Amino acid sequence: MANVLRASGLFIVLLAANMAQAAEFEAHPSLAVSEEFTDNVLESNTNRISDYITRVQPGIAITYKAPILTGDLSYVFDYRNYAKNNHDDEIAHALSAKAELIPVKDFLFLEASDEYQRVSLDATRDTSKESLFVNQVDRNIVTASPYFIFRPTLRMRLKTGYRFIDTRYFKSIAIDKTNHIGYLDMAYEVSKRFSLTADYTFTRETADVDNYSQHQALGGFRYEYSDKSFLFAQAGNAWTRYDSRQRLNNLIWNAGITQVFNTVTCTVITGVKYDEDPLRIIMQESFVSGIIVKNLTRGSLSFSPGYSEYVLTKSNILQTKKYGATVHGQYDFTADFSGGLSVTGEKFEQPLLGSYTRRVIVDSSLSYLLARQLSLSLNYIYVDYYSPKIVTDNRHINRAIIEIKKTF
């Protein structure tokens, strides 16, 4: 809670310091009240216990725009009452605050952000659809980044700066971390549609369990072959050295293509990234993913397949292979009444356990605008797990939620 208050206070101070300038300012308080029924509140595979969860969520959204400062803040205070006392009543927070200061126009910039939210303990598996608390932890990430933009020539753009990232977890075995990052990005415009790119990043991370230093170097191109359609690719290497003297040398890449048609947009991306892992230092993820979006007169349809390999970076051991796809549809029945449906199928292969887990998620919703900025929504979520050998990965959960929300 102290971190949330500090972030909100810093945001307000920055705004107050610039209120004298011509600026746009909006503040919208809100209040949401919801009731949830779940038939497996503890996500047990043998002892299924149901519960009713009442949530009261006052919040506020602030937007500020001025010549040298922009900022957005969204905060929700979340009180949760469990009617059958299967879990202690709790207070949760959701904060997203971002600000950008421009002390010297087109040259010197300062970005700052704070993200406080509840996240999954498992970096390979998002559990937010299944429960409000099982296998989850509260995380706060504070980021501050001063950077410069240089234009040595009309065709060349250089961006260099420093990024400070502090990651904290609360009431958990998760590992706190602090990152100091220096970076240099270069783009050279060969023509209006074709550019060469090069990126270098140095990261120094300190944590309770171990520290490491990492260099990343990438080079490639970006080509816009038609209006809003483009292709990009970068390849390079990452050199990681732990203070415990272990050294790793990994090929990395980042590539993708986006094709825009009249009502259809197709995107495919692939790359290697280092994910924040609550239970470890970092997790290396090699991935291929795509999405096809079809815009309808009153809604949209999308299909998004994906494949990822998660490697325990320090030991260089493959932990999980994940295959999955999501089909999503959204439709506006009237100007005030809309609905949505998502179906996700995933398979998690876990070589270290000699088994796999299959997961299916069905997420459906209806929303009706009762009056101006007053809405009523219904949400039903079904989650089903199956594993031939992992006993705890055989369970299913039904969640039904009704919510009324007023924005002022």
Range-by-range predicted roles:
Residues M1-E24:
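Cleavable N-terminal export/targeting peptides
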Residues A22-F408:
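Gram-negative and organellar
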